[in-house]
Amino acid sequence: MNKTSTIRLALVGCGEHAETGHAIPLARYQSEHPYSIALVAACDIRIERAQRFCQRYGFKGSYSNIDELLSREEIDGCIAVVPPERISETGILLLNRHIPCVVEKPLGSVLAEVEELAIKAAESGTPNMVSVNRRFMPFLNRALEWAGNAGSIRYVHCTLARHARSEREFIWATAVHAVDTLRYIAGEVKKFECRTMMAGTAAWYAIDLLFQSGVEGRIDVLPTAGMVEETYHLSGEGFHVSVTCPFGRKRGWVAHRNGALVTEEWAPAEMPEDLVNGCYQETAAFIRALTDRSIPKPSIADVAPSVQICMSIANEQIGR
C-alpha cells in the first residue's frame, strides 16, 4: 500500500487497557503492514501518558485534550478508551464530527447514556465499532466453525469467574462480555431470567437465556470465585465444544464428537497476548473496514442489547 492511502489513526485514552488492548495491537499491525496506517496522535488528560505512548508505540503527536487533537490533526479513525462515564459523550463527539470510531463497552455508565449514544450513532451515519474482543478470539471462531460443520447448536453456556472483584458495576462493566459473546454465538435474546445470589462479598448471578434462534443458554457470573477463568461451551446432538479464553490456566479449545475427543488446540506459552485474546484481530478488522470503506462490526447498535440486558439486571438488583 502506498503512502497516499495510509489510514491515519488517533488513540484517545492512554491507560493500562488502552495499552494492552489497543496500542500494542496497533503497533504490531503497523510493523506488519508498513505504510498502511499512521499513528498520528495519542491523547490523555495526563499528557505524560500520551507522551509515553509516542515513545513506546510510535504515535507522532501527544495531546491532553481531544478538542485540540481534532482541531490540529486530520484523522481517518479514532479509538476512544475512556472511563464508562465518558464513553457516551466522547463517542457522540466523534460521531457528530463524522470521524469513524471505536468505543469501549459498556457504552456508558447508565442506561440513558447507552441509549443516547445508540440514537446518535444511527442519526449520524458515521461508521462505528465497539471493542468487544471476545468476538474476535481465534480459538472461539475456530470452535464456532467446527461446531457449524458438526451440526446445530442447541445449548450454550459461559462461566465467567474472577478473583476479588466486588465492585457493584461488575455485572454491566465486565460480565457484559459473556452476554455479548453468547449473543454473537446464538443470536438475539428472546427472553432471559436472572437469579442473584447475595451471600458473600459480592453478588453472583445465574442468567438463563432463550434466544430467538431456539438455542437455550446460561451464564454463571462468579466475580469472587478465587480464580480468573472464562469458558464457553457449545453443545449439540452428538457433539460438544469448550473454549477457554481469554482467561484461564490453559487457553484454547477442545471438541468432542460421539464420545471421543476429536480436536484440541492450546495457546503456546510464548504466544503474544493480543493474538490470543482477539485484540489484534479486532484492530485489524477496524483498519480493514476503513481501508475498504465497509461497515465496521460489531457496531454500537450490535452491542447495545448486551449492555441493556446487564444494566437491567443491575437496576433490578438495586430496586430501580
Q: Can you annotate each of these PLM segments?
A:
Residues 1-6, 77-82, 126, 285-320:
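C-terminal helix-rich "cap/oligomerization" subdomain common to oxidoreductases
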Residues 1-57:
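N-terminal Rossmann-like dinucleotide-binding module
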Residues 17, 45, 270-284, 298:
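Active-site loop of classical SDR/Rossmann-like NAD(P)-dependent oxidoreductases
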Residues 57-119:
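Beta-loop-alpha module in the N-terminal Rossmann-like domain of NAD(P)-dependent dehydrogenases
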Residues 85, 108-165:
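A contiguous active-site-proximal alpha/beta segment in oxidoreductase catalytic domains
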Residues 103, 128-130, 243:
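Hydrophobic residues in well-ordered beta-strands that form the structural core
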Residues 131-138, 160-192, 302-303:
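Mid-domain beta-loop-alpha active-site segment that forms a flexible
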Residues 173-249, 280-294:
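Contiguous beta-strand/loop segments that form the cofactor/metal-binding neighborhood of enzyme cores
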